[in-house]
UniProtKB/Swiss-Prot annotation:
Presence of the UniProt keyword Transcription regulation in the record: yes
A family per Pfam: TACO1_YebC_N
Taxonomic lineage from the root: Bacteria, Pseudomonadati, Pseudomonadota, Gammaproteobacteria, Legionellales
GO cellular component, one term: cytosol
GO MF assignments: DNA binding
Family: Belongs to the TACO1 family.
Keywords: Cytoplasm, DNA-binding, Transcription, Transcription regulation
Location relative to the cell: Cytoplasm
Protein name: Probable transcriptional regulatory protein lpg1286
Coiled coil: none
């Protein structure tokens, strides 16, 4: 679990830094618009929208920009309809990779994703080729110095499936259906959540050497830089050396 937690923290910090340079605002706006179009503009009754708005706020997006994206989604105007799609493949070292996208042009998206895999020693697979290696779950990372016993008690009582503590970081894993119940219970108790999201979590991590890790990181970075890509997941287990170099 520690490997999952550290990688999530690195991705979180990198995302905030990238957002300050304007690299991910387009993706965030796209997710907010689609979430509002699919589930309505009320955050209290639309969990996907609530999570998307939280990500945007964490990335320092202005509330006016968020509200405009919600209005576009609810109104169903401005541009082609976005379609959610997922691509599966293998990266360097046989690492399994899932790529979640939102796009108005499937041909463009699959071409760009395939090019990224090919350029960095991977290959795009067929539907179902690696998705069975992942489970859709909720992940909640608590802010530092939160009371461990209290967090564990509240999380488990609310339906969490696992709670782990390492180096002062508390990570909570939930079934999808219990994710918002657990998150709300923690926040209602006055506990501080650092980050939370629904994720595709690898059932088993695959250890890779540092050379493979460097190639894999280049592939993941290239995928994440594509406008149509929203999330990239892998089952790689990075060494402490690599994790520290990215921290």
């Amino acid at each position: 679990m520690a490997g999952h937690s550290k990688w999530a923290n690195i991705k979180f910090r990198k995302g905030v830094q990238d957002a300050k340079r304007g690299k991910i605002f387009t993706k965030l706006i796209r997710e907010i618009t689609v979430a509002a179009r699919m589930g309505g503009g009320d955050e209290s009754s639309n969990p996907r929208l609530r999570d998307a708005v939280k990500k945007a706020l964490n990335a320092n997006m202005k509330r006016d920009t968020i509200d405009n994206a919600v209005k576009r989604g609810v109104g169903g105007v401005d541009g082609e309809a976005m379609i959610a799609m997922r691509y599966e493949g293998y990266g360097p070292g046989g690492v399994a990779i899932l790529v979640d996208c939102l796009s108005d042009n499937k041909n463009r998206t699959v071409s760009e994703v395939r090019h990224a895999f090919s350029k960095h020693g991977g290959n795009l697979g067929t539907d179902g080729s690696v998705s069975y290696l992942f489970t859709n779950q909720g992940e909640i990372l608590m802010a530092s110095n939160q009371p461990e016993d209290k967090v564990m008690e509240i999380a488990i009582d609310a339906g969490a499936s696992d709670v782990a503590v390492e180096d002062g970081q508390i990570e909570i894993i939930t079934p999808v259906e219990a994710y918002h119940t657990v998150l709300n219970a923690l926040q209602d108790a006055g506990l501080e959540v650092e980050q939370s999201h629904l994720t595709m979590r690898a059932q088993t991590l695959v250890p890779i050497n540092d050379e493979t890790a460097e190639s894999l990181i280049k592939l993941i970075d290239m995928l994440e830089d594509l406008d149509d890509v929203q999330e990239v997941y892998s089952n790689a287990e990075f060494s402490e050396k690599i994790l520290e170099s990215m921290n």
